[in-house]
């Protein structure tokens, strides 16, 4: 099944000159969404993660779907100030400025094997920061998975070289 037709191109969003790749049509279609979960499930079968980590916000949708599909636990990585209790945090560079991500300090008990998921891999900044955060929290990062990858932005190159990185749809 070709998943490209489940992605809608939205020009000039969120600002002029940006072509946004929207997975909303995929989320609305039970057949397309099931195909995504099945394909990511095959990756889970090979990597054998203990937990799925999803990056705010659409990574929550992908991550919870996959965690439920494979009967695994889910850990959210959030923007600052959104998680109660003790957290680990990491600051990372954006095109203009910096941002911060946080994870519960007790989320990685027992050094679990972690698969990080998100809807999109672009420059790799957020995914790379999440990979570092997982390691800081004590997790063993085994892979990253994305629905869409914008290959021309070379985000894959910013991710650790010792993990498996998979994307279901590639745009160049």
Curated annotation (Swiss-Prot):
One of the Pfam families matching this protein, by short name: Pribosyltran
Record key words, sorted: Cytoplasm, Glycosyltransferase, Purine salvage, Transferase
NCBIfam families, alphabetized: apt, PRK02304.1-3, PRK02304.1-5
Enzyme Commission designation: 2.4.2.7
Taxonomy, superkingdom: Bacteria
Subunit structure: Homodimer.
Function in brief: Catalyzes a salvage reaction resulting in the formation of AMP, that is energically less costly than de novo synthesis.
GO cellular component: a single term: cytoplasm
Keyword Transferase in record: yes
Gene that this polypeptide is encoded by: apt
Protein name (database record): Adenine phosphoribosyltransferase
